[in-house]
């Protein structure tokens, strides 16, 4: 590239020297000069801008026209995310806007400020023009979608719906038909499946008051539209040669096989026949295919784990065209998604749709025969009654008896066929069940053996166990997954209880709270009518020594986890909604943040609050109870200056939403939590999904973040311990400041156990402050230069510290380090932001509760008259466990689960959707992510039409 020519092009485009620009473009066309027409400037006056951006901004129409004719990219982005259309619209240059639109400028591109060209302009006429063009472009896309649905072009439908700004999937034509109508009446099954997955509404009607179901042809299509399910009568194996892309080796030819929802690839066809030397495979659950319109052979498959695999159909392969591959992948993806992603807890759903359809047809035939038999018996009895009157009816009588006999025989045959089908189906299912049970038995024994050997190997490499932690994690409230699940969480009740017997030690009483904190566990402050908060539970916890964890967890392999009933002994007497409320234990940090005028100091307090939210999990081995759908919890703390309401808004996946507000109208704190779980054999990892938002009303600021990932180690053998790791990014949406905290993984010798480090940065990524500490104990702030110097010096001494750490670990292999003031080295010049409060003396006997947690389930007669009947405090199983009545708690827990299951079945039969009471789903006003927003009116105390969940 000729850098000098590019600089000249940028200069002349900026200054409007049309003749000079034309000369350069002609020289480039003749290949006399090699330069990029879309080059970006590097000097201060044109940094990151292309010649077209500059010409549009400064209003040089002739230059713009010449550049576009020469092939300049009309939708090129500068470093601020602006297209040339943004710049022309911003400066109010109507003629240039029209010219750019003639060259198909995209009006939907959003720049770095979150604005489209329409939103960037101050000119009313330009805004109206862009709105009209947007409508036209959108309608063109809708017409393309309708046409593709009519013709069954699944790849085109997928490409249109995968655009950054896709057409409305529920758009309609002149007759009111949506794309789903069009695909349904033409019997394009793959298109229907794709549209349904993309949010097409099967209940919409056209102008003739017809739904897609009314226009559908065939039982299979109708079944898909009725239940939004897929009938898999005979999922065919599909195979053939495909080129597959690789990051390091480029394109390579494989023999690719699609079977039972799994995509596998082999070096050659004979390997696929014998299922040997498989080079790789991918389950197609929730897989999405995308294509490039410019290449008729290329397509890619995005799998459920966000990995993308590129394929190319060989040009000489006529039998396996790209369209056939796409249809086959869509079909196998639908199969895999249906059987892997459906709610398996709904007992009224048939597991095998195809067998159920066969049985239905067989029963229908039997019913027809039975009705005929009833009619013949009726006529036969009538003839018998008339037999005394007419003696000459004997021949007719005998003939009728023959007909009756034949009808009986046909009925018996039909019922026998039906019985045979039932018998065959039962035999096949029993055989498959025995096979799966044997597989699970072998796999679980092998897993236990491998885990034991691995544990012993680790102990031989490191003379002693690494430092362990037995913290309980909020997000782990009812699950393990065979691979990865966002569904019902029921199985992890056993997980966090495993180490209780090994670590029943109270927290170090040497810890102290910083002066700004307030006592959560005592005092005379009023809270829902309670004058003095309790400092103990009615009954201490029971011993868990007699319960085997692995004997329960091994049942999780290959099974739906929500079906496994866990002993209530592994619980603690709190609902998960109450555990969420423990975020508010250190509310004083929010009040302190509001009192500061410096945004950096406010961010420090918010970061400390985010870290302190998980601190209560230290040594909390009990698992909170699963909230029932519609369950609520409220807490009013006048002494801490807040009130909170939470609700279980979804059961599959389990989502808990909460909303807290300051009593002095100084803050709002809200969010929704649900975990994404992965089972790795020896450990379980939970990635907490959901956005947490804090609004400081006095400063008109909003902060958002997500919690770190939590991992439970040694669930099979060895000491159970939990660590939290991953980055937590706290964003100030007003100033653009960010705080990036790194929750560090433990490491080989436990050097980084529980450590948290990070920086506060402004929007230009300049470091303003460094933060460090442990999430189990404290957090400090220090100047970033001082912190970097300390880290650099610490790195030099790493080997010496490792040796020292290894020696100390070998002496105390089974001990968990208790956090104290010396476990975090305080860098000179540091300021303490937060320190954890000491726990009450009886904490070890009270489920290792903090003083704050001790009062969460407290209730009296006055409070019972105020709170709604859905409040956690009124749950009989939690109340029984708190009172030490374990047997009653277990019975009540089972009763409530069965009641919830029955209510779900009744709603399914009546086609009634569950409606949340205090929250509604919508985008987070600051991050844009899907969230649950408080609807208001809870504190009006008008609790009518509440569900009966207890």
From Swiss-Prot:
Q: Which residues lie in Basic and acidic residues bias regions?
A: 890-901
Give the residue ranges for region: Disordered. Answer: 795-821, 881-913
Q: Name one GO molecular function term.
A: cholesterol binding
Its main subcellular localisation, reduced to a broad class, is other
Give the superkingdom in one word. Eukaryota
Q: Where is this region: Interaction with RAB7A?
A: 1-237
Which terms does the UniProt entry file under GO BP?
lipid transport
Q: Which UniProt keywords apply?
A: ANK repeat, Coiled coil, Endosome, Lipid transport, Lipid-binding, Repeat, Transport
Which residue ranges does the UniProt annotation give for the motif FFAT? 469-483
Xref: PROSITE patterns:
ANK_REP_REGION (PS50297), ANK_REPEAT (PS50088), OSBP (PS01013), PH_DOMAIN (PS50003)
Q: List the GO terms this entry assigns under cellular component, sorted alphabetically.
A: cytosol; endosome; late endosome; organelle membrane contact site; perinuclear endoplasmic reticulum; plasma membrane
* CDD domains reported for this sequence: PH_ORP1
- According to the UniProt entry, the coiled-coil residues are 430-463, 877-913
| PANTHER family recorded | OXYSTEROL-BINDING PROTEIN-RELATED, OXYSTEROL-BINDING PROTEIN-RELATED PROTEIN 1
Q: Can you tell me which family this protein belongs to? A: Belongs to the OSBP family.
What does the protein in this record do?
Answer: Binds phospholipids; exhibits strong binding to phosphatidic acid and weak binding to phosphatidylinositol 3-phosphate. Stabilizes GTP-bound RAB7A on late endosomes/lysosomes and alters functional properties of late endocytic compartments via its interaction with RAB7A. Binds 25-hydroxycholesterol and cholesterol.
Partners and quaternary state? Interacts (via FFAT motif) with VAPA. Interacts (via FFAT motif) with VAPB. Interacts with the GTP-bound form of RAB7A. Interacts with OAS1B. Interacts (via FFAT motif) with MOSPD2 (via MSP domain).
This protein is called what?
A: Oxysterol-binding protein-related protein 1
The taxonomic lineage of its organism, from the top, reads: Eukaryota, Metazoa, Chordata, Craniata, Vertebrata
Gene name of this polypeptide: Osbpl1a
């Amino acid at each position: 590239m000729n850098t000098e020519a590019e600089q000249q092009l940028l200069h002349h485009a900026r200054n409007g020297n049309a003749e000079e620009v034309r000369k350069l473009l002609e020289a480039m066309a003749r290949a006399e000069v090699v330069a990029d027409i879309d080059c970006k400037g590097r000097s201060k006056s044109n940094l990151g801008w292309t010649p077209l951006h500059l010409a549009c901004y400064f209003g040089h129409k002739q230059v713009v026209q010449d550049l576009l004719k020469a092939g300049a990219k009309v939708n090129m982005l500068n470093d601020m995310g602006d297209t040339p259309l943004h710049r022309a619209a911003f400066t109010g240059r109507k003629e240039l806007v029209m010219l750019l639109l003639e060259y198909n400028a995209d009006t939907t591109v959003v720049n770095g400020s979150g604005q489209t060209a329409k939103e960037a302009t101050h000119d009313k006429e330009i805004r109206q023009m862009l709105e009209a063009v947007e409508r036209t472009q959108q309608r063109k896309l809708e017409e393309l979608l309708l046409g593709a649905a009519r013709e069954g072009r699944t790849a085109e439908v997928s490409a249109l719906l995968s655009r950054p700004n896709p057409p409305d999937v529920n758009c309609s034509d002149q007759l009111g038909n949506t794309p789903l109508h069009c695909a349904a009446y033409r019997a394009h099954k793959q298109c229907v499946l794709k549209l349904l997955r993309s949010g097409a509404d099967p209940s919409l009607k056209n102008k003739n008051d017809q739904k897609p179901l009314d226009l559908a042809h065939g039982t299979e299509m109708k079944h898909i539209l009725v239940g939004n399910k897929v009938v898999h009568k005979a999922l065919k194996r599909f195979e053939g040669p495909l080129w597959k892309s690789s990051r390091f080796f480029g394109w390579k030819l494989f023999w690719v096989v699609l079977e039972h929802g799994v995509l596998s690839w082999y070096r050659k066809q004979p390997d696929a026949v014998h299922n040997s030397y498989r080079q790789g495979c991918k389950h197609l659950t929730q897989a999405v295919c995308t294509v490039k319109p410019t290449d008729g052979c290329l397509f890619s498959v995005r799998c459920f784990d966000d990995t993308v695999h590129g394929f190319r159909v060989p040009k000489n392969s006529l039998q396996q065209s790209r369209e056939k591959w796409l249809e086959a992948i869509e079909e196998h993806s639908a199969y895999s998604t249906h059987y892997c992603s459906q709610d398996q807890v709904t007992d009224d759903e048939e597991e095998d749709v195809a067998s159920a359809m066969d049985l239905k047809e067989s029963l229908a035939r039997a019913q027809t025969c039975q009705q005929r038999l009833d009619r013949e018996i009726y006529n036969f009895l009538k003839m018998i009654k008339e037999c005394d009157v007419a003696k000459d009816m004997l021949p007719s009588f005998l003939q009728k008896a023959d007909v009756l006999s034949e009808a009986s025989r046909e009925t018996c045959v039909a019922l026998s066929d039906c019985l045979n089908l039932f018998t065959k189906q039962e035999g096949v299912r029993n055989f498959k069940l025995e096979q799966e049970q044997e597989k699970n038995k072998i796999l679980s024994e092998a897993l236990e053996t491998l885990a034991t050997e691995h544990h012993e190997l680790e102990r031989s490499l490191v003379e002693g166990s690494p430092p362990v932690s037995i913290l309980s994690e909020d997000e782990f409230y009812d699950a393990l997954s065979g691979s990865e699940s966002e569904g019902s969480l029921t199985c992890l009740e056993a997980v966090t209880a495993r180490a209780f017997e090994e670590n029943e030690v109270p927290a170090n009483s040497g810890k102290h709270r910083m002066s700004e904190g307030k006592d959560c566990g005592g005092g005379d402050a009023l809270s829902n009518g309670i004058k003095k908060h309790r400092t103990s539970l009615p009954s201490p916890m029971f011993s868990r020594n007699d319960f085997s964890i692995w004997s329960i967890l091994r049942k999780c392999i290959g099974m739906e986890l929500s079906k496994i009933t866990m002993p209530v002994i592994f619980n603690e007497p709190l609902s998960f909604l109450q555990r969420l409320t423990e975020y508010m234990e250190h509310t004083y940090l929010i009040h302190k943040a509001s009192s500061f005028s410096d945004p950096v100091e406010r961010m420090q307090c918010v970061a400390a609050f985010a870290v302190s939210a998980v601190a209560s999990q230290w040594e909390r081995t009990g698992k909170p109870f699963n909230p029932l759908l519609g369950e609520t919890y409220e807490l009013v703390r006048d002494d801490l200056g807040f009130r909170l309401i939470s609700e279980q808004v979804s059961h599959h996946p389990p989502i808990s939403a909460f909303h807290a507000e300051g009593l002095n109208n100084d803050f709002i704190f809200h969010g929704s939590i649900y975990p994404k779980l992965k089972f790795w054999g020896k450990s379980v990892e939970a990635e907490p999904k959901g956005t947490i938002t804090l609004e400081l009303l006095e400063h008109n600021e909003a902060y958002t973040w997500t919690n770190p990932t939590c991992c439970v180690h040694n669930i099979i053998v060895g000491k159970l311990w939990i660590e939290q790791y991953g980055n937590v990014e706290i964003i100030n949406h007003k100033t653009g400041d960010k705080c990036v905290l790194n929750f560090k993984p433990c490491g080989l010798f436990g050097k980084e156990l529980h450590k948290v480090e990070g920086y506060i940065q402004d929007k230009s990524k300049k470091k303003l402050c460094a933060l460090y500490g442990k999430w189990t104990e404290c957090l400090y702030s220090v100047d970033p230069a001082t912190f970097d110097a300390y880290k650099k010096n610490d790195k030099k001494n790493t080997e010496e510290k490792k040796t020292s750490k290894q020696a100390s670990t070998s002496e105390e292999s089974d001990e968990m380090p208790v956090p104290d003031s010396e476990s975090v080295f305080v860098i000179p010049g540091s300021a303490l932001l937060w320190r954890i409060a000491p726990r009450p003396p009886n904490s070890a006997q009270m489920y290792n509760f903090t003083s704050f947690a001790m009062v969460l389930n407290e209730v009296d007669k006055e409070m019972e008259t105020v709170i709604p009947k859905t409040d956690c405090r009124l749950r009989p199983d939690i109340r029984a466990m708190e009172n030490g009545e374990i047997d009653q708690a277990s019975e009540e827990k089972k009763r409530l689960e069965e009641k919830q299951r029955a209510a779900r079945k009744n709603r399914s039969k009546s086609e009634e959707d569950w409606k949340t009471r205090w929250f509604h789903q919508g985008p987070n006003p600051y991050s844009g992510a899907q969230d649950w927003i408080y609807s208001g009116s809870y504190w009006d105390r008008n609790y009518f039409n509440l569900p009966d969940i207890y």
